């Protein structure tokens, strides 16, 4: 997609992508007015302090005192710091514009620094601004209203004390920059506080002059606490150095500031720049170069190797690189160029101190004495060899006029410090001898001939004739057309090829001006398309070559001449095919004839000369026609789209304004929605088409309501049977943009507004910083790489976000609109997925694998934004999903260790790699340990507790619980209730106490670890041992007993040690003692003196078993 630079109501150049709209005068007037009135707002905060009257002299004293305190002493001592301050102005204003464009919001604090810098710059430049008002307007340095206010000041009686005001503005700027965020936040209560009326009147009305300085002084005073007031206690600094100050400022502005300003703005085209580095629509057309025109030339200036590493060049880079008027046509075009560490041999023929064009280089644009043009650079230089010795040196009259241009900033514009004499560089002579080398230097440039020059120390270095790549598409006229106020309001596109900026071209052509006016006034797409061809042609007809060249012809015979026609590189020349004898059919000839007019138009737009086109076959000729038509159609489409927001859609955009919400300026689109609905009442098709094109080609990323409005229009059109008709008016490309599901490498907007075949769509952002907007269906959104934004409004359905992006530095966001706040949503976790669900069940967003690596993995969403300005980062989301509710929750620990409390409900708790504390609390809970040494507590209810790899402690609590230790040396406590305990592998300990109920232990393991059963609160004599089949039952009472399942199956099922309060039983031969009395204890359920079952020998048998096994428990 194409980037475009637009100037918005004098606010400055703002880069919008793609084909982005101006925001409209209403919106930006409101915004700029708000900026201007911010000082008024701050003034009102401490209004009570303004009761103290301050005189003008006190104000002067304050300003001078402050300037002295920061080391300026009434003069500019550090130009670099001022230039750095200027950098901040541009950077901060661009950042504010970016925030507004991408989010529709900005914090007032974000513009505080920019405002302060503006006031400082205004103060520093007051003397020179008076003389440069119009120049500053062209540079778009300050907002329109601020410039207007300053101009009114300078044209009023205030001019008599301009230096005083200059001091005040400086001081004001510094104080605004230092102003505290807290106080500023307290003052922002209502957008009505930001009316521009006071300051507008403050500066504009000359009759208020007598009060102005006092008012400004009072304002400054209100910003400063009493204990920091710099002007209390004397008048030592009054009026110091005012004249010197003004003189130094003017000198600084002329010598340092203004050139810097112009250079800065050269990096950002001042006009509606609709060309990327190399537009797609021109690619195939320019590939016809080897088949175009019987005349060609290359740019071949002489260059000198100044640093000893050979002659180096750079590629033609469109507007980002050097632009130079090689042909002396008054048009600077993009060109290959010599690198900054080497130089071009030049001669200032007109003595204006500037290298104006190719005639002042040494090459094929150098005019010789006989009126012809030089064949190459060496031939051009040879004319200066007045003594015929084949060397150019001091013996030749013109030697002293030669200069070497070392283009340090690579802009193609010579500055005084870039032009150096041969003497300065230690060059003694230039040798006219050379060899043809035709060396490819890369970047489209060639070293055609190479010789040498001699230095004053006797050494030699390389000198050569370059063939530089040419790009005539990217061009800038060297002169400017003065526009009237009315002409300056016309729609505009940047000049291209041999065409001036559209607005300037219209000022010079009545036909174009009338056509542009008619086109701008057309109210429907159909009406504009009916005029588009005529508009394109009228602009092309302003080409200075229009009508001067011979009609285009076809040929199979290529003839090479020099110096005229299309600029080709040597590689392009080599591609030409000569002397092919082919005749064309009548059909092909007719197609060529039909394309002639379009070929002439494309020549004007691309700076080419296609007076002759060459072909090798009929297929070749027809392909020329196809490329011509395709290129023209793409050109027309680009012009239409880039004029769209300056013409037909401009009235809608004028309805956008600003509102204040939660201390944040926000774009207010309510008027825009009303405007579309108003049009729809009388012309539904126009409203449908206009809204669709605004969404397809605009940059209103934050206007989510517009997507829903479009979806409503689509549904209504379908019901009315008009949808197919509306789509035909829109065209396939617009429909495809609104229905597309896959992005590109650019910053795409993917949206479900009903143009697709399915209500449920899948959106893929791929590369770039994309915006993916789900509709009412169940959508799948995958952002890909880049900083992506996923947008969800009310009724967003059951959507899935897949956000895998491992790149560093990216920032992915989920944005909830339509007034959705965090309180309206629940945040839960399921496995590694984040589930964001509307409490009214109107939708759910599942962010897949969000919690991989505890939310630091490649799937994370960095921030979740809400309309009220609240932002949730990853850390906050991690806390939210660990909060329990009264329902059944799923809570997960993190790798660093967590404490989870399930609360009420039947909960699921999951440990991780850390040492976790997992409390189920009330309810029938399921608790799963992780890899750490975890503590699991079931609490009330019938719980299931599962250990894992670590040495875990499992406590079932009240209820009939299931405990499984798995791996590790675990401790299992069943607690009250009839519990099931399974230790798993490792040396496990089972704890049994009074009131624990009737528990079952399953202790099977294949390892040889030692397991323990600990009876707390019991002595050895209190517990009776019973064999029940293959199980061992240990009973302390009828209510409290433990059954060890399969104890007598073998060693793998046994508990090795029984620990009591007074002793421990531990013997690997324990089973044989039990077996000796097997017939005595079998089938007994209660210990005691039950002689009917035991023959009166039970206690004796138990004693005989226990006696050898008694050991004293360790202390």
Swiss-Prot record:
Report the main location listed first in the record: membrane
Q: Does the keyword Membrane apply?
A: yes
What's an example of a GO molecular-function annotation for this chain?
A: toxin activity
Gene3D superfamilies to which the protein is assigned, alphabetical? Serralysin-like metalloprotease, C-terminal
Q: Where in the cell is it found?
A: Cell outer membrane; Secreted
The protein's superkingdom reads: Bacteria
The residue intervals holding the Hemolysin-type calcium-binding repeats read 755-772, 773-790, 901-918, 919-936, 937-954, 955-972, 973-990
* Biological role stated in the UniProt entry: May participate in the pathogenesis of meningococcal disease.
About its domains, the entry says: The Gly-rich region is probably involved in binding calcium, which is required for target cell-binding or cytolytic activity.
Q: What is this protein called?
A: Iron-regulated protein FrpA
**Protein species of origin:** Neisseria meningitidis serogroup C
């Amino acid at each position: 997609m194409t980037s475009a630079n637009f100037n918005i109501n004098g606010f400055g150049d703002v880069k919008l992508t793609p084909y982005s709209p101006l925001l409209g005068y209403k919106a930006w007037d409101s915004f700029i007015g708000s900026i201007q009135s911010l000082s008024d707002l701050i003034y009102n905060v401490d209004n009570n302090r303004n009761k103290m009257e301050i005189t003008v002299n006190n104000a002067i004293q304050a300003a001078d005192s402050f300037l002295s305190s920061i080391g300026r002493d009434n003069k500019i001592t550090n130009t670099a710091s001022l230039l750095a301050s200027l950098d901040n102005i541009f950077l901060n204003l661009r950042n504010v514009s970016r925030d507004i464009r991408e989010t529709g919001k900005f914090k007032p604090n974000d513009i505080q620094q920019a405002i302060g810098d503006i006031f400082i710059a205004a103060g520093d430049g007051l003397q020179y601004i008076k003389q440069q008002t119009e120049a500053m307007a062209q540079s778009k340095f300050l907002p329109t209203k601020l410039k207007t206010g300053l101009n009114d000041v300078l044209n009023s009686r205030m001019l008599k004390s301009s230096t005083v005001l200059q001091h005040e503005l400086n001081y004001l700027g510094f104080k605004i920059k230092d102003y505290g965020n807290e106080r500023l936040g307290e003052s922002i209560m209502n957008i009505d506080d930001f009316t521009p009326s006071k300051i507008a009147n403050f500066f504009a009305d000359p009759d208020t002059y007598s009060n102005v300085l006092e008012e400004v002084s009072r304002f400054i005073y209100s910003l400063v606490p009493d204990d920091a007031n710099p002007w209390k206690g004397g008048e030592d600094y009054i009026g110091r150095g005012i004249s010197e100050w003004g003189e130094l400022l003017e000198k600084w502005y002329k010598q340092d500031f203004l050139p810097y300003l112009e250079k800065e703005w050269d990096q950002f085209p001042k006009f509606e720049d609709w060309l990327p580095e190399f537009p797609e629509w021109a690619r195939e057309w320019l590939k016809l170069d080897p088949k175009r025109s019987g005349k060609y030339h290359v740019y071949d200036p002489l260059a000198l190797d100044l640093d000893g590493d050979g002659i180096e060049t750079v590629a033609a880079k469109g507007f980002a690189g050097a632009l130079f008027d090689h042909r002396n046509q008054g048009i600077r075009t993009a060109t290959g160029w010599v690198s900054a560490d080497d130089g071009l041999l030049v001669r200032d023929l007109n003595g204006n101190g500037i290298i104006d064009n190719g005639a002042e280089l040494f090459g094929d644009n150098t005019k010789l004495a006989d009126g012809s043009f030089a064949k190459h650079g060496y031939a051009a230089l040879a004319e200066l060899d007045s003594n015929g010795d084949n060397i150019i040196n001091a013996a030749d009259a013109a030697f002293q006029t030669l200069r070497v241009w070392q283009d340090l900033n690579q802009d193609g514009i010579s500055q005084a410090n870039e032009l150096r004499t041969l003497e300065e560089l230690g060059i003694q002579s230039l040798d006219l001898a050379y060899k043809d080398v035709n060396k490819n230097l890369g970047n489209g440039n060639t070293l055609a001939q190479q010789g040498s020059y001699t230095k004053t120390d006797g050494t030699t270095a390389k000198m050569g004739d370059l063939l530089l790549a040419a790009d005539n598409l990217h061009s800038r006229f060297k002169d400017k057309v003065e526009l009237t106020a009315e002409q300056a309001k016309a729609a505009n596109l940047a000049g291209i090829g041999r065409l001036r900026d559209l607005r300037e071209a219209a000022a010079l052509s009545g036909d174009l001006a009338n056509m542009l006016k008619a086109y701008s006034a057309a109210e429907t797409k159909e009406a504009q398309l009916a005029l588009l061809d005529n508009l394109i042609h009228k602009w092309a007809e302003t080409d200075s070559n229009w009508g001067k060249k011979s009609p285009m012809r076809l040929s199979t015979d290529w003839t090479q001449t020099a110096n005229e026609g299309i600029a080709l590189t040597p590689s392009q020349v080599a591609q030409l095919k000569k002397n092919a004898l082919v005749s064309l059919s009548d059909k092909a000839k007719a197609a060529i004839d039909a394309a002639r007019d379009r070929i002439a138009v494309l020549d004007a737009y691309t700076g080419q000369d296609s007076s002759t086109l060459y072909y090798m076959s009929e297929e070749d000729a027809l392909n020329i026609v196809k490329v011509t038509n395709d290129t023209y159609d793409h050109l027309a489409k680009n012009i239409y789209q880039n004029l769209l927001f300056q013409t037909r859609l401009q009235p809608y955009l004028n309805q956008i304004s600003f509102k204040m919400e939660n201390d944040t300026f926000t774009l207010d689109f309510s008027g825009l929605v009303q405007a579309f609905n108003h049009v729809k009442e009388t012309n539904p098709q126009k409203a449908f088409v206009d809204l669709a094109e605004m969404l397809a080609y605009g940059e209103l990323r934050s206007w989510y309501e517009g997507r829903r409005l479009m979806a409503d229009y689509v549904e209504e059109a379908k019901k009315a049977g008009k949808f197919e008709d509306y789509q035909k008016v829109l065209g396939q490309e617009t429909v495809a943009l609104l229905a597309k599901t896959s992005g590109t490498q650019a910053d795409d907007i993917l949206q479900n507004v009903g143009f697709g075949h399915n209500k449920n769509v899948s959106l893929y952002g791929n590369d770039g910083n994309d915006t993916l907007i789900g509709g009412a269906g169940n959508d799948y959104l995958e952002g890909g790489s880049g900083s992506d934004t996923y947008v969800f409004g009310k009724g967003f359905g059951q959507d899935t976000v897949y956000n895998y992006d491992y790149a560093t530095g990216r920032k992915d966001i989920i944005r909830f609109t339509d007034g959705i706040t965090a309180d309206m949503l629940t945040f839960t976790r399921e496995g590694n997925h984040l589930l964001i669900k509307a409490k009214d069940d109107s939708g759910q967003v599942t962010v897949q694998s969000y919690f991989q690596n505890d939310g630091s993995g490649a799937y994370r969403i960095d921030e979740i934004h809400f309309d009220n300005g609240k932002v949730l980062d990853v850390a906050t989301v991690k806390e939210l999903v660990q909060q329990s509710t009264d329902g059944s929750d799923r809570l997960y620990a993190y790798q660093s260790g967590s404490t989870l409390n399930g609360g009420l409900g039947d909960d699921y708790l999951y440990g991780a790699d850390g040492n976790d504390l997992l409390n189920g609390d009330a309810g029938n809970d399921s608790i799963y340990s992780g890899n750490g040494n975890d503590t699991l507590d079931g609490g009330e209810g019938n719980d299931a507790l599962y250990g894992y790899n670590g040495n875990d402690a499992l406590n079932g609590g009240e209820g009939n619980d299931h405990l499984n230790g798995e791996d590790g040396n675990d401790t299992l406590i069943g607690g009250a209730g009839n519990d099931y305990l399974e230790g798993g592998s490792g040396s496990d300990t089972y704890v049994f106490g009074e009131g624990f109920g009737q528990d079952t232990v399953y202790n099977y393991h294949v390892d040889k670890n030692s397991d323990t059963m600990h009876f707390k609160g019991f002595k050895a004599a209190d517990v009776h041992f019973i064999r029940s089949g293959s199980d061992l039952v240990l009973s302390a009472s009828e209510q409290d007993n433990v059954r060890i399942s399969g104890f007598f199956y073998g060693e793998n099922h046994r508990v090795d040690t029984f620990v009591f309060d007074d002793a421990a039983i531990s013997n690997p031969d324990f089973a044989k003692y039990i077996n000796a009395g097997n017939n005595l204890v079998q089938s007994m359920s209660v210990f005691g003196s039950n002689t009917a079952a035991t023959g009166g020998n039970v206690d004796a048998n138990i004693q005989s078993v226990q006696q050898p096994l008694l050991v004293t428990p360790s202390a």
